[in-house]
Design a protein with these regions (language model features):
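Non-catalytic alpha-helical scaffolds and adjoining flexible linkers that form interface surfaces
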Residues: 1-282
Length: 282
């Protein structure tokens, strides 16, 4: 196999031997790749600082002659995203984004859109000096755009119950399992026990709709939401991906919620038992 040259984002890694390390990278043309880096763990390794998670790099690698792994030949650091490592909130948000990409991205599969999404997210998270709220909005936007790219965009124009076109309203009912909104007619019908449904404001709906279509290229494109509405749409995005991607337990809502622990609760409940179940699940 001839050497391959790709832009890449480091997704993480694991020690392989006393002197080597395996890193996982996201590439635009070949998706997730596992590269063995020989000599990476030596005290004076030339790779020090180059293999850190989040780094944007240029790599040259080729297939191992004796195994299934790729062997890293050269690596050039393009952007280290040092601002992310300097902020606990930014580091947390970036870690969540990377874990989600690792979960959905497959090896040897063209992933240009996912690569660009993660690159844009890291760029904005790295340069953001506006605090926790902006980072939370970036992460919410990232989640909905990710869902759209993997074919799980929610239905926000037609009712998931009857297919009727939705009219403008102050609030909507978002059905988690069904993956979309109910019209006023279907919303009037009683919910079945155990149904997971959330109240979504028109402002929050606009954020979800825009996020599914494109990721912002600047912080200024984000429209702030009141805290309660942000918590709700944040919680819905977590639960939506949990359910529809059947995420691994290590990516559960509990472990990927914001460090402050803020959680918006399901607002449509059918019994005391259902209420207890929903609250425990969050």
């Amino acid at each position: 196999m001839h050497p391959v040259s790709q832009d890449a984002i480091v997704l993480g890694g694991v020690n392989y031997s006393d002197s080597s390390r395996i890193i996982w990278v996201l590439t635009p043309e070949f998706g997730r790749q596992s590269l063995i880096v020989k000599g990476a763990r030596r005290p004076r390794s030339k790779y020090q600082g180059l293999l850190e998670t989040f780094n944007l790099v240029r790599v040259i690698y080729r297939k191992s002659r004796t195994g299934s792994l790729y062997v890293l030949r050269e690596i050039d650091l393009q952007r280290p995203f040092t601002g992310i490592r300097a902020s606990l909130e930014a580091f947390w948000a970036a870690s969540i984004a990377v874990e989600l990409v690792k979960e959905v991205c497959k090896e040897e599969q063209e992933s240009k859109d996912l690569f660009e999404l993660l690159k844009e997210f890291l760029t904005l998270a790295d340069s953001s000096e506006k605090g926790e709220e902006i980072l939370r909005m970036l992460l919410v936007t990232f989640r909905w755009r990710l869902a759209s790219l993997v074919g799980l965009s929610p239905r926000l124009v037609e009712c998931v119950g009857c297919g009727a076109k939705l009219s403008k309203a102050e609030k909507y009912r978002f059905m988690l399992v069904e993956g979309g909104l109910l019209c006023s007619g279907c919303e009037a019908s009683p919910l079945r026990p155990g149904t997971l449904a959330f109240s979504l404001s028109y402002r929050a709906l606009k954020l979800v709709y825009r996020s599914c279509r494109r990721f912002p290229t600047s912080i200024e494109e984000l429209t702030p939401l009141p805290t309660a509405e942000l918590e709700t749409v944040e919680h819905i995005s977590q639960r939506y991906l949990d359910h529809h991607l059947a995420l691994h337990p290590r990516l559960s809502t509990e472990k990927l919620s914001w460090p402050s622990g803020n959680k918006a609760l399901c607002v449509h409940r059918n019994s005391e038992r259902d209420s207890e179940t929903v609250e425990n699940a969050t």
